[in-house]
Amino acid sequence: MTYAPVTDVLSGKLAVDSEVTVRGWIRSRRDSKAGISFLAVYDGSCFDPIQAVVPNDLNNYNDEVLKLTTGCSVEVTGTIVASPAKGQDFELAATEVKVVGWVEDAETYPMAKTRHSIEYLREVAHLRPRTNVIGAVARVRNCLSQAIHRFYHEQGYFWMSAPLITASDAEGAGEMFRVSTLDHANLPLDDKGNVDYDKDFFGKETFLTVSGQLNAETYACALSKVYTFGPTFRAENSHTSRHLAEFWMVEPEVAFATLDDVAKLAEDMLKYVFEAVLAERRDDLEFFASRIDKQAITRLEQFVSSDFAQVDYTDAIQILKDSGRDFEFDVEWGIDMSSEHERYLAEEHFKAPVIVKNYPKDIKAFYMRQNDDGKTVAAMDVLAPGIGEIIGGSQREERLDILDARMIEMGIDPEHMSWYRDLRRYGTVPHAGFGLGFERLVSYVTGMGNVRDVIPFPRTPRSANF
């Protein structure tokens, strides 16, 4: 017996008249007056289910087939035939239907045959991948993930696994989740009455990582080209459509590289992964274009064919001032541009993806390379039409004296970062990198308006279910 994924049958990979068995779940059942049932069976391998045509002469037709409801799991054996129905070229002429698992109560099944709101689906995150929309998101997410790994592999990068538990704050924002095994009901205290983290598991205060960048720098300064791709954590009390407490980051780090080098890398990577998803997940993208965002496909096609614009932060501020727009947030040199500013630049002024470079140092992290003007750093943001910032990066400060001065200026004790300073003490090199928020990328591709709907189990303030 040959078990076949539904995608192989529908794509014509298997020959007509061959006998196969598909395994999956019932999306719908329709019965005709002629004594034939039509089962829509999906297995998640592609967007569409396959239609199984079931005759009433099967021995379990009355006792089981006619009782199948949405969500029941089945194995259907039959012959692949050309389909006269619209929408797919092939269907299955069933010779056997085996029920693997029943839905106990079809009336109360949370994923019953009806369209559910996105908000409702968040409440049943353990069942929502069974829906068209979240199933499509999952396949697109996988495609993008595989394409990212493939891109860096082809470019000669080494993937490194950055630690999730750290004693360093890469962003200097202090919005970190503490990791501790201390008994909260009986905390050890030091002589000053503060919690004594010397008694904790790691012998010091530790946190969940906000970025793998600092660790990636250590490997870039030995392997030349590396990247991390893993979960990061931010304890921001933000209830927006763009924020999660747990999310995934793609962070390449390149030795002997400048800001311009990683700006080009960012453009090449985004175009590569968008071309991949357009080629590999067209069925899912067509669904998003029909149900979620009409521009889902054309936006990616235009992105891939566009030349990225580049502009200095100072010039970008002047463009915003000269726009005549009444922005919600005032535009002045030194601000951290808001989403409305970013989207104006990408969507209305440049009408293309744009890289903004050389930001004021006072709004950027300690590790960014200071420019000769003493006011700005070699930092960049990639702004995409439709979403705004999608990538943030910089050239790293490779000069030890300037790095030390910057840390002191920002209230960071250089001694606490001795291992990071060693990279500058022993064979320092110019190096650069960036961070891509993976959920924002998936949101951009699918048109899903909230990042909570593009990660399997979203972690947000007051919510850590499942």
Curated annotation (Swiss-Prot):
Question: MF terms per GO, please?
Answer: asparagine-tRNA ligase activity; ATP binding; nucleic acid binding
Q: Which residues form a coiled coil?
A: none
Which PROSITE patterns does the record match to this protein? AA_TRNA_LIGASE_II
Which InterPro entries does this UniProt record tie to the protein?
A: Aa-tRNA-synt_II (IPR004364), aa-tRNA-synth_II (IPR006195), aa-tRNA-synth_II/BPL/LPL (IPR045864), Asn-tRNA-ligase (IPR004522), Asp/Asn-tRNA-synth_IIb (IPR002312), NA-bd_OB-fold (IPR012340), NA-bd_OB_tRNA (IPR004365)
Q: Report one GO cellular component.
A: cytoplasm
Question: Reaction(s) catalyzed by this protein?
Answer: tRNA(Asn) + L-asparagine + ATP = L-asparaginyl-tRNA(Asn) + AMP + diphosphate + H(+)
Q: GO biological process: any one? A: asparaginyl-tRNA aminoacylation
Protein biosynthesis as UniProt keyword: yes
Entry keywords, A to Z: Aminoacyl-tRNA synthetase, ATP-binding, Cytoplasm, Ligase, Nucleotide-binding, Protein biosynthesis
EC number of the protein = 6.1.1.22
Family named by the database record: Belongs to the class-II aminoacyl-tRNA synthetase family.
Instruction: Cite the record's note on assembly.
Output: Homodimer.
Q: What is this protein called?
A: Asparagine--tRNA ligase
What's the name of its gene?
asnS
